[in-house]
Amino acid sequence: MSRWMDDAVEAYLTDLAGTEHSDPVLVEMEARAEVNGFPIIGRATGRYVELAARTIGARRVMELGSGYGYSAYWFARAVGPGGEVVCTDGDPQNAELAEGYLRTAGVWDRVRYRVGDALTGFAAEDGEFDIVYCDVDKPGYSDCWRAARDRIRVGGLWLCDNVIWSGHVATGTDRDRLPGWTAPIVEHNRMVAEDDRYVGSIVPIRDGVMAALRVT
């Protein structure tokens, strides 16, 4: 839930995404998130990132923060056979869960999962990416952008979740349970907006997705 978008609108977008694409694996992953209070991008945002990836013909995607593979599911659909999604997460259990879910979905052969710090895993990868997707703990957003901005190909995308942060980016306030997390998101959003090599905008789906296209 976005905590700022109207519930009826969010439910409509989610239902519409479910009409366009349904998979029992997604239902399982969403149920786990609901029971455990685990943050996932949700079906409407999932459809959006798949659309974005397909639009630019993405074949190589780097995820900074992957959880148990929900967002990777959508990217793996987009990159197709022979494409690659590199996942990162600090919890080995999430890697095991991701393998189970994505193997069942028939896309595990397109995924490599690095257990450990997201930026350490990113630094260990060579070359450029078509997409770098960021969903780490929010104090790390600016560092992730700094690491990624030179490694996205021209014509590639930077995608970053939770950039509206329940509306707190507009008021400068914090979520009660996560003090100090708003300012780093605001800084990240400003840095992306000010980079002349990128054309970006915040897509107000769920909790907001920054989408920035590298043009030079």
PLM regions: where:
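A short alpha-helical cap/connector motif
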Residues: 1-131, 138-159, 163-216
